[in-house]
Amino acid sequence: MSSPAIEAVPDILSRLKPIQIGPVTVDEAVLLAPMSGISDLPFRKLVKGYGAGLVMSEMIASQAMIYQNKRTMQMATTSEDEYPMAVQLAGTEPELMAEAARLNADRGATIIDINMGCPARKVVNGYAGSALMKDLKKAGAILDAVVKAVDLPVTLKMRTGWDDDNRNAPELAHIAEESGIQMLTVHGRTRCQMYRGKADWRFIRTVKDATSLPLIANGDIVVEEDALECLNQSGADGVMIGRGTYGRPWFPNQVKHFLRTGEHLPGPGLQEMYDTVSGHYEAMLEHYGPVIGNRVSRKHVGWYTKGLPDSAVFRNGVNNTNNPKEVHRLFHEYFQGLLEQEAA
């Protein structure tokens, strides 16, 4: 049975009109977050195919990009199937960030996104990511350099600030707009929170009030109602979903449907899930090669099947073979068994 419509939905729909990022139009602003080790080309294409308005690459280190590190170049690979898409860059030197942006523009990126939100210690220790929120002069220099370096629209992702005493996202938003940034995304936590506590969607409204740029809210959107509440509290123009897509590449589309109608769109049935899992697995093998692709796939298989009957035994089998044909056999055997149980 479908859920009753939510009274607030018409107000939200008036804000979920297409957003303009320079010359790029995003029809419905439900976005896939840049997630290290997750937002690779196979996953982005899958999420885009399910209806996400815009997808972003995992974070790419600007210096490694310039040195054409093999792994980094693979991370920066794009496909027309995922357009429009953004390549996210991290770094601390304006000149290197500008050069990396030019390289990605030449390789097919639609948008360049600048990371000033990553809380990871190794990134912060290199004075990149959210560390730049402690040095707005340096942050502004990076924004200026990247905007001037490419003809593509440039966007910025940040946190609310470094810590509770320094929530300076509104100030950085103003600097970004002056630099020519075309869209902002704000994760509703400080760097010092990491992923603890709850994202402060209400504070994001202060960032929205500080700028005329399209603003996307991010953090803790794991069910459809979260997106609605986030938009109500933040006043944002859209939402960006990260961990909520683990094992659910269709979730952004469910969010879009809920915001349009106030009703829940059911997830895929077992046959569609089998097709999705096996197709995603094959795409990872093609992208990474059989050895790395098989290894990378295991976390996704775990997320896809979490909560399904006898999934622990199935996952154990998948995790203990490196033979793609055997993995496909296990997929077929497991989902065929579930389909037969469902039909009984």
Residue ranges, per PLM feature:
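Alpha/beta catalytic cores of nucleotide-metabolism and tRNA/nucleoside-modifying enzymes
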Residues: 1-22, 26, 36, 41-42, ...
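N-terminal small/glycine-rich loop or linker at the start of catalytic domains
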Residues: 19-31, 65-85, 118, 122-126, ...
